[in-house]
Amino acid sequence: MNRAVQTRLRGERGSVLISGMLLTLALLMVLGAAVDIGHAFIVRRDLSSLADGAALAGAQQLDQQAIHQGQLALDPQQAQAAALSALSGAPGIQAHAEATPEQVHVQVTRRFPTILLRLVGLADLTVSAQANAAPRAP
């Protein structure tokens, strides 16, 4: 009986190595996803700050004729230009701004390369953020 057990165990030699390698690969994939998704959250936070700043810059462009008539309204063309100008120094982003007399809407998008998810075929991620701002009386 002892000899039968030894013969059986010799046939399974190295099976733990394969299981260990598969477990290590799975852990690396989870770690890669965590690193890249964490990076995506940081990029989104930065984009959100940029969009907020650009929308606020646009919301400061008031229509002077409307002010003289006692109304608080934006000059849409100047508001859109100011919002896009506020984003002009930010590298690697795509920006879109729309303005009406009531508000400014800004959307920014950035594509960035992944670090470890590239190993499973996901070479880059796209993250976007948007913000709205409207003028208010003090």
Language-model segments: which ranges?
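Low-complexity, S/T/G/P-rich flexible repeat/linker segments used as non-globular hinges
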Residues: N2-R3, I115-P138
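Solvent-exposed, flexible loop/coil residues
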Residues: G20-M21, R45-D46, Q78, L116, ...
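Intrinsically disordered, low-complexity segments enriched in polar/charged residues with Gly/Pro
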Residues: G32-A34, A83-L84, V120-G121
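Alpha-helical assembly-interface signal, strongest on the long, hydrophobic N-terminal helix that forms
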Residues: M1-Q77
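Short amphipathic secondary-structure patches
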Residues: A55-V108
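Short, surface-exposed, charge-dense and proline/glycine-enriched linear segments
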Residues: L28, G89-P101, A123-A134
